[in-house]
């Protein structure tokens, strides 16, 4: 197993979930067990597959709150995921890992609460990183924050929900390079929920597909997001005729 595997896997038994827990389609047929093989894992699926909720439940199980640092803080919006975390059995290497959990759709809220959410690296540098990110667009702010953490070479478990949100294709490529740096460094680990075929194309990542049948590995060529975009780009005019006729 490669270095940086802070989280080696997890098991989810929906029968153990707390009251009001989110119901994930991938748990429709009972418990699911996932072994993580690479320190860069991408969670992929259609809208409503439960990628965000799964990441948030994993954050709660690891006691990683949005923005990183401290204990997980439940909110009204996160309550279903927090209840689901009771159903998760973590397979960790040693102690429960420190980490960074970011949801792109709540980045502004996280930044607004930055005074209460210290980075794993605290002090003047950490506050400067928050200020820099706060002055940028949402997509660029997420990218700057991640860049500062990866450059610091801290050993962290990154739980990232759609970090490509708000980024142009060119900046998604920059994000891909950033994730590659994390992957090559080998000390940290990232689980990334994404719809981006650009991120999915990383040659060293593990792709996990979520649907009503569970959670399963798939090669890139079998991921609809990547396959359909490739088909469209090969012959846009033919694809448009089929779509619009």
Short names for language-model regions:
Residues 170-245:
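C-terminal lobe/lid and adjacent interdomain/linker elements of RecA-like ASCE P-loop ATPase modules
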Residues 1-31:
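N-terminal pre-Walker A segment at the start of P-loop NTPase domains
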Residues 40-42, 155-159, 189:
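Residue-level preference for the first positions of well-ordered beta-strands
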Residues 31-38, 149-153, 184:
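Phosphate-binding P-loop
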Residues 48-49:
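ATP-binding Walker
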Residues 40-42, 52-119:
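ABC ATPase nucleotide-binding domain signature region
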Residues 45:
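The Walker A (P-loop) glycine that initiates the GxxxxGKT/S ATP-binding motif of P-loop NTPases
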Residues 99-107, 113-114, 119-151, 157-174:
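Conserved ABC ATPase signature
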């Amino acid at each position: 197993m490669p270095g940086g595997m802070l989280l080696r896997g997890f098991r989810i038994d929906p029968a153990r979930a707390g009251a009001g827990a989110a119901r994930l389609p991938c748990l429709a047929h009972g418990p699911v067990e996932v072994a993580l093989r690479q320190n860069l894992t991408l969670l992929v699926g259609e809208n409503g597959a439960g990628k965000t909720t799964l990441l948030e439940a994993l954050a709660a199980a690891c006691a990683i709150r949005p923005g990183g640092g401290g204990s997980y803080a439940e909110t009204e919006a996160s309550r279903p995921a927090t209840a689901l975390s009771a159903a998760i059995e973590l397979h960790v290497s040693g102690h429960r890992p420190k980490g960074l959990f970011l949801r792109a759709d709540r980045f502004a809220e996280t930044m607004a609460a930055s005074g209460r959410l210290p980075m794993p690296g605290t002090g003047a540098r950490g506050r400067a990183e928050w200020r820099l990110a706060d002055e940028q667009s949402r997509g660029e702010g997420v990218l700057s924050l991640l860049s500062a953490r990866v450059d610091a070479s801290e050993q962290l478990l990154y739980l990232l929900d759609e970090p490509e949100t708000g980024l142009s294709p060119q900046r998604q490529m920059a994000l891909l390079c950033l994730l590659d740096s994390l992957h090559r460094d080998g000390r940290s680990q990232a689980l990334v929920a994404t719809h981006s075929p650009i991120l999915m194309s990383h040659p060293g990542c593990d792709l996990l597909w979520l649907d009503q049948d569970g959670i399963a590995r798939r090669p890139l060529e079998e991921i609809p997001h990547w396959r359909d975009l490739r088909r469209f780009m090969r012959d846009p005019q033919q694809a448009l005729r089929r779509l619009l006729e």
